[in-house]
Amino acid sequence: MELVFLGTGAGVPSRGRNVTSIALSMLNERNAIWLFDCGEATQHQVLRSHIKLSKLEKIFITHMHGDHIFGLPGLLSSRSFQGGDSDLTIYGPAGIAEYVETSLRLSGTRLTYKINFEEIEPGVIFEDEMFLVTADDLDHGVRSFGYRIVEKDKQGALNAEKLKADGVEAGPVFQKLKNGEIVTLADGRVIDGKNYIGEPQKGKIISIFGDTKETVSELELAMNADILVHEATFEGDKAKMAGEYMHSTTLQAANLAKAANVKKLILTHISSRYDRDASKELLIEAKTVFENTEIAYDLAVFQVGE
């Protein structure tokens, strides 16, 4: 899995940063891409990346502010032109269905695929055999969600060396043993596949937050995450301003990462007041509290678990 930051700016696009959108690429895991927020011109950023809209399976909207949703109509239309024909699900606050449907209807846009809308409340919003996604309210004046994506633990690997040492030759029997089945060999021996399977592989946890000021719900959403993606609209000494505008600072994000025992913090949603050099200072500041911090730039790619 990898995170591709398509837009990392706050409020309005700047020369250095487009507005918010993050792609979670899971091509190896489920041959799919999930998108978190879709600010204006996100589809232009997609063209500059390796992301394929035909692989887009789900879109998660954190809140209904324009810098997080104005890119949706164009991106959804372009997905049709790029061969997307599988159903797409959009999760988000109340109003997301009306916004998308109205935009498409008034523009006369006809899609080649079906959109399913899930207007969510806090709790589990999606689960299958591979992933569990939960959401909770943040604090941004309008309803804003944070998302927690949990990859379920994977079965341990089959110990082929141990099987070989026990005189079991590779072949179709390996698949049965990998499934944990009890198998009778040609020589009459009965072996249990569970004795040859290693420890389960721990799944990854990714927490992606919408815009927010400091709030208590953040801690549970972020707890023990492999990656926490958090806004850092302002530098540390502007905490009062951040609170008034319902946003966060670098230090507030770093303190949360430390308290939640996350492995990596990625800062995004950077105000246009900070150019590239000033952004480096934001990173240095956050690292004084939480060392394993990165600051996202447009088109930056981060591997999950590294």
Swiss-Prot record:
Name the coenzymes or cofactors required: Zn(2+)
Recorded hits in SMART domains, A to Z, give: Lactamase_B
Q: How is the cofactor bound?
A: Binds 2 Zn(2+) ions.
Record-linked InterPro entries? Metallo-B-lactamas, RibonucZ/Hydroxyglut_hydro, RNase_Z/BN
On whether Transcription is a keyword of this UniProt record, the answer is: no
Give any GO molecular function from the UniProt entry: zinc ion binding
Any single Pfam family the record assigns to this protein: Lactamase_B_2
HAMAP family recorded: RNase_Z_BN
- Function according to Swiss-Prot or TrEMBL: Zinc phosphodiesterase, which displays some tRNA 3'-processing endonuclease activity. Probably involved in tRNA maturation, by removing a 3'-trailer from precursor tRNA.
Name of this chain's protein? Ribonuclease Z
Query: Which organism is this protein's natural source?
Result: Listeria innocua serovar 6a (strain ATCC BAA-680 / CLIP 11262)
